[in-house]
Curated annotation (Swiss-Prot):
This is 4-coumarate--CoA ligase 2. Residues 332-399 are annotated as: SBD2. Changing V341G: Reduced activity against 4-coumarate. (E)-4-coumaroyl-AMP binds at Y239, S243, A309, G332, T336, M344, D420, R435, K437, K441. PROSITE patterns: AMP_BINDING (PS00455). AMP binds at G332, T336, D420, K437, K441, Q446. It holds the Pfam family AMP-binding. Changing K441A: Abolished activity against 4-coumarate. The keyword Membrane does not apply. Its EC number is 6.2.1.12, 6.2.1.-, 6.2.1.34. It comes from the Eukaryota. Major enzyme of the phenylpropanoid pathway that mediates the production of several precursors for numerous metabolites and regulates carbon flow. Catalyzes the formation of CoA thioesters using 4-coumarate, ferulate, caffeate, and cinnamate as substrates. Follows a two-step reaction mechanism, wherein a (hydroxy)cinnamate substrate first undergoes adenylation by ATP leading to an acyl-AMP, followed by a thioesterification in the presence of CoA to yield the final (hydroxy)cinnamoyl-CoA product. Almost inactive toward sinapate. It comes from Nicotiana tabacum. (E)-feruloyl-AMP binds at Y239, S243, A309, G332, T336, M344, D420, R435, K437, K441. The lineage of its organism: Eukaryota, Viridiplantae, Streptophyta, Embryophyta, Tracheophyta.
Amino acid sequence: MEKDTKQVDIIFRSKLPDIYIPNHLPLHSYCFENISEFSSRPCLINGANKQIYTYADVELNSRKVAAGLHKQGIQPKDTIMILLPNSPEFVFAFIGASYLGAISTMANPLFTPAEVVKQAKASSAKIIVTQACHVNKVKDYAFENDVKIICIDSAPEGCLHFSVLTQANEHDIPEVEIQPDDVVALPYSSGTTGLPKGVMLTHKGLVTSVAQQVDGENPNLYIHSEDVMLCVLPLFHIYSLNSVLLCGLRVGAAILIMQKFDIVSFLELIQRYKVTIGPFVPPIVLAIAKSPMVDDYDLSSVRTVMSGAAPLGKELEDTVRAKFPNAKLGQGYGMTEAGPVLAMCLAFAKEPFEIKSGACGTVVRNAEMKIVDPKTGNSLPRNQSGEICIRGDQIMKGYLNDPEATARTIDKEGWLYTGDIGYIDDDDELFIVDRLKELIKYKGFQVAPAELEALLLNHPNISDAAVVPMKDEQAGEVPVAFVVRSNGSTITEDEVKDFISKQVIFYKRIKRVFFVDAIPKSPSGKILRKDLRAKLAAGLPN
């Protein structure tokens, strides 16, 4: 990562002035700092059963859960795993752990048993908070390793019920000293290459990131206590956890929780609760654009539609503008390691700026961005494409137990290299044009080719394999495999797909298999994915 520093860096900043950020505060103290102004207002609305928790309720329940976790043996710097869909309990567990100076690692409840256990093991989780239907995925691992399982619905044999946490006395929270650099969240990300790694996000980092979005006289993302935010994106993903939950808590907005996206409930909830802020991802935007039912609902309350996690095309933008007549539509750009927000659309500001279609915002305030030539390491002026780099208090502390991967991602001067290629135009707007990194983006979810390749190579009838993205209208990208059969093997496409689908979550399943004589590689043995992508683009895989 050490690049030749021949010239002075060309650094880009927000059009908004820097602000004071109280990032000495622990995350929970910061989020609830102004709670006296809205303690009786709705904080969480459970879309599934219409239950409403006020800000006072959420703070109290989170404190009770903190005391309960302490009673179950959780100490500062210990980790709990939250293996849940969006739910009030997810919120109470996450904030409860923060009160103790403990860490939450969030996992997708749809993960296979192997994927969940891998993350539980890597993060050294002491407690797993989940639902009864997922207990079988972790039961053997938990019992062998003295890990407690706490269920939010019914508790199968050997598991505890979430009420052991919520019935604790909130005054029993121990006094703990939380340092700004202590880790509070540990999402897993594949980074720019390779297998999923624990991303250490600190109290200071998340406080800074939330403040960069919603604090200040002219916040970049203007949300207030009269707003209703739709939380349909999964909270185990940092975009939803940060830009929906934490930002919403900080400003006193109502957060309407949906367990999973389905278009009818989605439209009904927007109409019933007069949702004003819609943080979406392109697949949801596509569903809105394509559904004839949208016209039967009143969506006029929505004033902001944010899209993140993957680029949104111009046609899609125009269609959505027509469906949400009163909404400003814009994009943000994030990466888990960056805390996660790097850039955000300034049309969302309290005093908005004009924006361009296709841009993903301008760099957030209190941060610095530069565009670097991947070959020379020199920073580039406006309108020249290079690797996007970000620096500021919001970025990750590093990867858990992986100093090498950390050093490859963050240089000695504190610059985080994103692996994304983009440029900044004359109006400070950021455009993303390509990815250096190898990740496949399926509906905003990361798929690491290396993970699938390792599984493919375990098959006795496969001698070599490479996985690359293929464009897909609905998902954005899907994984496809190029496979070299072992001597004399007659393994079929369906057999390969079936072999993988048993081992991974749905979005990592291989959609096509192309059999080849050899995988193209560089002299150092690196797979030349560029060549394989070019083959796909030319329509000549075999």
